[in-house]
Amino acid sequence: MPSTFDSKLFLKTVSSSPGVYRMYDEEGTVIYVGKAKDLKKRLSSYFRVNLPNVKTQALVSHIANIDVTVTHSETDALILENDYIKQYMPRYNVLLRDDKSYPYILLSDHKHPRLAYHRGPKRDKGSYFGPYPNGGAVRESLHLLQKIFPIRQCDDLYYKSRSRPCLQYQIGRCSAPCVNKVSDEEYAVQVKLASLFLKGKDLQVMTELVSKMEASALALEYEQAASYRDQIAALRRVAEQQEVSNTSGDMDVIGAYYASGVACFHLLFIREGKIFGSRSYYPSVPAETELDEVLSAFMIQFYLNSDSQRTVPKEILLSHGFDDLPELERAIQTALEKKVEIKTNVRSERANFLRLAVTNATNAVNTRLSHKNTVEQRFLLLEEALEVSTLIQRMECFDISHTMGESTVASCVVFDREGPNKADYRRYNINGITPGDDYAAMKQAITRRFDKIDKNGKIPDLLFIDGGTGQLRIAQKIVDEKFVDIDKTPMLIGVAKGEGRKPGLETLIYGENEQSFTIPADSGALHLIQHIRDESHRFAITGHRNKRQKTRNTSTLESIAGVGPKRRKALLQYLGGIQEVKGASVAELAKVPGISLEMAQTIHDSLRG
């Protein structure tokens, strides 16, 4: 492999998101295009010591550069990969392989058929619709079908055990054939219509529903006619949404992201509804420039550049608005002598395209901020600003996150001279403190981090505390205690938010003497501090949200001895939810499959306290 390509450095900048990668040779020719569910995992596999086959060895030996485009889903990655393969015809692309089975929607062959998610061998009798690109697409379709056709989606065990309608019947998403709330004939009609809809025969479904509504009205069956009317309305809403989401025509989609002095504009070029290509632009941004000014300057220079010979589409989607946008739109129309619309508030597929562009812009900025040369330069500037005599090799930053004291989590992120060192990131679940006590939370986190530290451990040269003097003082006290017998001691610095929490106005505080100081807003040293502070905040809040969601999702049934996952599922499905389980009598609990009278009594007593 050419020495100009550093795979280790490159892999540190790659995320674990789904996406597409393009490999180039020394002449800049695309030699391979691939997709991955996890870009980091897939790309890492190319640079193992023992590669699996000769083709891969030959491919890797010609790699001079790799370009990555993040997508929101594997489906987006697949579409973009196909487009790139058609465009570049790379010599190492032979075929597209996917060893995973594709999911389907199953319309079962029962007296009262059900709609269900299916993946794997088609052993069950019934009609299969698909394949769908992924499980999410199937679940979204099933959710949509529930709104239009009141067909059951429950499994057979749940269906056979019902003695009363479930919640789906009460909200109008199932006709409850399990307890004879609908005739077999009418249920069969709905099954037929759902089957036609899944085959794409929307017009035929609409025609039949209108015919049945009119027939019911003539027969004075007004309630049934009203039901058909509601179905027609739901079907029309879906048709309208599909018309918007099936995007056609040409668009430029621009996602912007600006952080720590680096701006990126990621453009998706949509032609005839497909992603034709993408490109990132990095304008040079003077210090303390507002985002509005960056946006305006880029749009003007990009679209009013007569030398570029670019074809400007009639529709431009932009992730952020700014004050001069209407004027810019008029200027472009005047220069091009045609109508051009710049939109910032869009929905459906257009919104998905915008999110995709912003994701790629964000990823590009983070990659730039993580780049070795950029980080190295900022480390040097930080050493100069702090007037330290030795190199800063390792920095750590702590932050606390909670919601009104709930599910408190502390984060510790680590930067070295190549940027974020995610392998050393740590989260600490904070317990045993007064809810909302950030000082106690910080004390616990710092104590746990350095509890068994010795001279051979990973000792940071700099330790940043995201907070004011109070939290910094506690952290300094813990560090002084833990490092009493160790020669090397980290320098502590507090990062206090500035007025209005605006970046560039932060106040820095030395932990040793609590003296405050500032660094110019346009300094790379401050940008480095902002980067590690923001990363610590992101890592803390992500952990907090996950912990909070897990806590809130934990059913009270889990605390009852003898009630495992299968029994919990049976109880919740049979009775319709946790509130119904709590309100059930011992006799009602005992009717649930797998629940004995003795177990029913235990559950009843436990829930009633």
Swiss-Prot record:
Pfam families: GIY-YIG (PF01541), HHH_5 (PF14520), UVR (PF02151), UvrC_RNaseH (PF22920), UvrC_RNaseH_dom (PF08459). Gene3D superfamilies: 5' to 3' exonuclease, C-terminal subdomain, GIY-YIG endonuclease, UVR domain, UvrC, RNAse H endonuclease domain. GO terms for biological process: nucleotide-excision repair; SOS response. CDD domains: GIY-YIG_UvrC_Cho (cd10434). PROSITE patterns: GIY_YIG, UVR, UVRC. It is found in: Cytoplasm. Its main location: cytoplasm. One of its GO terms (cellular component) is excinuclease repair complex. InterPro entries: GIY-YIG_endonuc, GIY-YIG_endonuc_sf, GIY-YIG_UvrC_Cho, Hlx-hairpin-Hlx_DNA-bd_motif, RuvA_2-like, UVR_dom, UVR_dom_sf, UvrABC_protein_C. Residues 16-94 form the GIY-YIG domain. One of its GO terms (molecular function) is excinuclease ABC activity. It comes from the Bacteria. Keywords: Cytoplasm, DNA damage, DNA excision, DNA repair, Excision nuclease, SOS response. Residues 203-238 form the UVR domain. Belongs to the UvrC family. The UvrABC repair system catalyzes the recognition and processing of DNA lesions. UvrC both incises the 5' and 3' sides of the lesion. The N-terminal half is responsible for the 3' incision and the C-terminal half is responsible for the 5' incision. Interacts with UvrB in an incision complex. NCBIfam families: PRK00558.1-5 (NF001824), uvrC (TIGR00194). This is UvrABC system protein C.
